[in-house]
């Protein structure tokens, strides 16, 4: 299956598989959002907010589906 991934606020610099801010990722059927983090090489603690198809995802064990649109945001920082 394929999911569209958008990485915000510089999170793409943490990914070993990123080809920019928006890209498609092939995953095995039944993959979870945690599996996506592993595939991308992004530490889970670097992702504060995950949105799938416009809805905030609270359960990182939730399964993704083919065609899902995933947006990942790091914690907000600054002053």
Where are these regions (language model features)?
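Ubiquitin-like/PB1-type beta-grasp interaction modules and other compact soluble beta-rich domains
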Residues: 1-78
């Amino acid at each position: 299956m394929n999911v569209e991934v958008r990485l915000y606020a510089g999170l793409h610099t943490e990914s070993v598989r990123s080809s920019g801010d928006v890209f498609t990722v092939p995953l095995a059927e039944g993959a979870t959002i945690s599996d996506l983090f592993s595939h991308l090489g992004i530490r889970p603690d670097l992702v504060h907010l995950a949105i799938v198809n416009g809805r905030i995802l609270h359960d990182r064990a939730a399964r993704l589906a083919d065609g899902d649109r995933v947006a990942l945001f790091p914690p907000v920082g600054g002053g």
